[in-house]
């Protein structure tokens, strides 16, 4: 805790130190394999060693390239837990339910390895810590991914906009069958966007304000 206070003071006084960086210094999009129609994976580059979203203090220095599918095909659900609207709902994320998500994730790891294996990165290279150079077969990849993969905080599409039987809101973001109720967040997206959800969600909110005002 003392170290965190010192880091905060350093940033407040000098605008320097660990708090002066976003910790995500670079990113990008790529195809996980040549037959993909469009870039289907997203990268986040950390010039640091991050474990469990930063909740675990690392015991070494390093850098990481996180890779994930842009459009996972697995589908979860959000359902009512009780009739009390103040109780928490049942949330089933259902990660990796679709086999193609696992295939894309394996391909993403291989692309990340190729990027970090370039000559320009060799002066900074060290031992691969995850998944580890010994992880090479589909079975080992799957074991690693199922045990170590983490969410990237992009839940969406649970109250989709549309005009089919699964749609919850219309083109004005109004909930079907209920008056004076709109939903304005990432849940109304029919499909997840290609990349982070913050900017598209702000756009949805801006549009909703126009509908309301």
Residue ranges and their predicted role:
Residues 44, 108, 125:
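Mobile, glycine/GP-rich and aromatic-enriched active-site lid/loop segments adjacent to catalytic centers
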Residues 33, 63-121, 140-213:
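C-terminal structured subdomain/cap of oxidoreductase catalytic cores
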Residues 1-59, 114-119, 136-139, 144-147, ...:
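Mid-to-C-terminal "cap/lid" subdomains and adjacent gly/pro-rich loops that border
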Residues 50, 128, 165:
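Residue-level detector of flexible, active-site-proximal loop/helix-junction positions
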Residues 123-136, 213:
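Active-site-proximal substrate-binding core of FAD-dependent oxidoreductases
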Residues 16, 100, 132-133:
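A general boundary/transition motif marking the beginning of the first structured unit of a protein
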Residues 30, 64, 128, 132-134, ...:
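Compositionally biased, intrinsically disordered low-complexity regions
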């Amino acid at each position: 805790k003392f170290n965190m206070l010192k880091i905060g003071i350093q940033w407040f006084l000098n605008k320097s130190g660990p708090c002066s960086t976003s910790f995500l210094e670079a990113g990008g999009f790529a195809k996980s394999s040549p037959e993909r129609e469009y870039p289907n994976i997203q990268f986040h580059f950390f010039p640091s060693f991050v474990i469990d979203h930063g909740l675990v203090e690392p015991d070494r220095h390093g850098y990481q390239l996180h890779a994930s599918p842009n459009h996972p095909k697995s589908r979860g659900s959000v359902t009512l837990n009780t009739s009390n609207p103040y109780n928490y709902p049942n949330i089933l994320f259902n990660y990796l339910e679709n086999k193609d998500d696992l295939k894309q994730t394996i391909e993403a790891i291989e692309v990340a390895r190729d990027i970090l294996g370039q000559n320009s990165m060799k002066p900074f290279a060290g031992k691969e810590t995850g998944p580890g150079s010994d992880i090479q077969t589909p079975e080992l990849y799957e074991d690693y991914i199922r045990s170590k993969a983490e969410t990237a905080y992009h839940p969406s599409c649970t109250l989709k906009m549309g005009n089919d039987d699964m749609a919850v809101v219309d083109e004005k973001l109004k909930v079907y069958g209920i008056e004076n109720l709109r939903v304005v967040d990432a849940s109304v997206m029919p499909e997840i966007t290609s990349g982070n959800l913050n900017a598209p969600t702000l756009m949805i909110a801006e549009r909703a304000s126009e509908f309301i005002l």
